[in-house]
Amino acid sequence: MSQRGIRSALFLVVLALPLAQAAAAQVALEGAWVRALPPTQTRTAAYLTVRNASAEAVVISGASTPIAGRVELHETLQSEGMMRMQEQSEVRVPAGAEVSFVPGGLHLMLLDLDAMPAVGDVVELCLTIDGAPLCTPAETRRDAAPAGHHDHQHH
């Protein structure tokens, strides 16, 4: 590539950075939680909703948390009557839309845990969105019910 071509490419990258940062600034992470499992487990899942209020689609290309050696984007799929998880290289969030990471669907797999967080512990969960980290606190709990919510069923 010529010097002029390199300069042109760098110029385009520099121009694109503020646009990517502006889109990422309009992305919100909501309702994050980590599933509590027995302390002997070395993996668990995390869930949240990613809301994109920008006019551009954004791409989630990774995730991290201090409690896990690695985090993978996964989706639970049904194939031939069997449920299986498939790793996703990225998840796209369309402009003006939201994507929910939920049990039985898209989720974050937290692998190589040093220790399972206890119910009530809050951990930092970060997503890589358009190349930049966006972090949120995630409460550890047993199920998807919001903290403090109890389902009272009468028979």
Question: Can you annotate each of these PLM segments?
Answer:
Residues A9-A20:
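Bacterial N-terminal signal peptides
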Residues I6-A9, W33:
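Short helix-onset patch at the extreme N-terminus, typifying the N->h transition
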